[in-house]
A protein has these predicted regions:
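Conserved mixed alpha/beta catalytic, RNA-binding, or beta-rich assembly cores of soluble enzyme
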Residues: 56, 112-115, 136, 157, ...
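Rossmann-like adenosine-cofactor binding region
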Residues: 58-61, 73-86, 183-230
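Short loop/helix-cap segments at secondary-structure boundaries that form the rim of catalytic
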Residues: 36-38, 99-104, 179-186, 200, ...
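Glycine/serine-rich phosphate-binding loop and adjoining beta1-alpha1 elements at the start
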Residues: 54-144
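Residues in the short beta-alpha loop(s) of Rossmann-like NAD(P)-binding domains
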Residues: 11, 34, 93-95, 175-176
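Extreme N-terminal starter segment of soluble prokaryotic enzymes
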Residues: 1-5
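NAD(P)-binding Rossmann-fold cofactor-contacting core
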Residues: 24-38, 166-186
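Glycine-rich adenosine-cofactor-binding loop
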Residues: 6-16, 21, 143-164
């Protein structure tokens, strides 16, 4: 097996990773990163000969390999048969893929996003991006705005630090009473996510970090007409 590492697709995180691996003296090629100046670009056939293949985070979008930095499309079902059982495959958010790839193609796919430290590090740019979108979407300052963060996971925790630091009047909703205690201890107002009815009309900005439906039609009708919801 060749000791080459192939970085296939992804965004600037994968470009930075490829560069760091090169700086460590490893043999690295990239494919699908040309718009981000990915190092050592190689044809797909050559990249697929590598012993270790690093896939994006997330690996797929709409059935295709996640390729935001190229105009090329590659269907996931076209890729899997071209990989070998003796390759080490690493990707992000692979829960739905790993078992099927082992069963159907004999491939072993490990999820690097399963590490807590990776998820925390990834939450930082996500939270910062949410702040950027909020500032672009409103003509008012974050300072003195009434903000609600729905959810107290990794991104919610970071926003609960960032927004008060900018002077926002910040409330955070959570399900667990232990989380509500931490929210209050950090100086934010705590609300129960299941009991948001009647509370939403006061907020200028709402950050929903929960990956499920919380703000249904009846809740949305409670919000102000100029409320920005992310």
């Amino acid at each position: 097996m060749k000791r080459t590492i192939a970085v296939l697709g992804g965004d600037m995180r994968q470009v930075c990773l490829a560069r760091l691996l090169l700086e460590d003296g490893l043999d690295v090629v990239s494919w699908g990163l040309e718009q981000g100046d990915g190092p050592n670009p190689a044809p797909l056939n050559q990249a697929l000969e590598a012993g270790l293949v690093l896939l994006p985070l997330p690996v797929c979008r709409a059935g295709n390999l996640n390729l935001p930095l190229t105009d090329t499309e590659l269907g996931a079902e076209q890729l899997w048969p071209r990989l070998r059982y003796d390759q080490l495959l690493l990707g992000g958010m692979t829960e739905e893929l790993s078992g099927r790839l082992m069963t159907d193609f004999g491939l072993t796919l490990l999820d690097y996003y399963d590490r807590e430290e990776t998820q925390i590090a990834n939450a930082v740019p996500t939270a910062e991006g949410a702040l950027q979108l909020a500032m672009e979407a409103t003509d008012r300052t974050i300072h003195a705005s009434r903000c609600l963060i729905i959810g107290y996971g990794r991104i919610g925790k970071l926003l609960a630090r960032m927004l008060p630091a900018l002077g926002a009047r910040t409330a955070v909703s959570a399900r667990r009473y232990s989380d509500l205690a931490w929210i209050e201890a950090t100086g934010c107002r705590g609300l129960r996510t299941a009991a948001l009815a009647g509370e939403l009309g006061e907020f200028d900005l709402i950050f929903n970090t929960v990956p499920s439906l919380v703000l249904d039609a009846s809740r949305l009708r409670e919000t102000k007409a100029d409320c920005v919801i992310l």
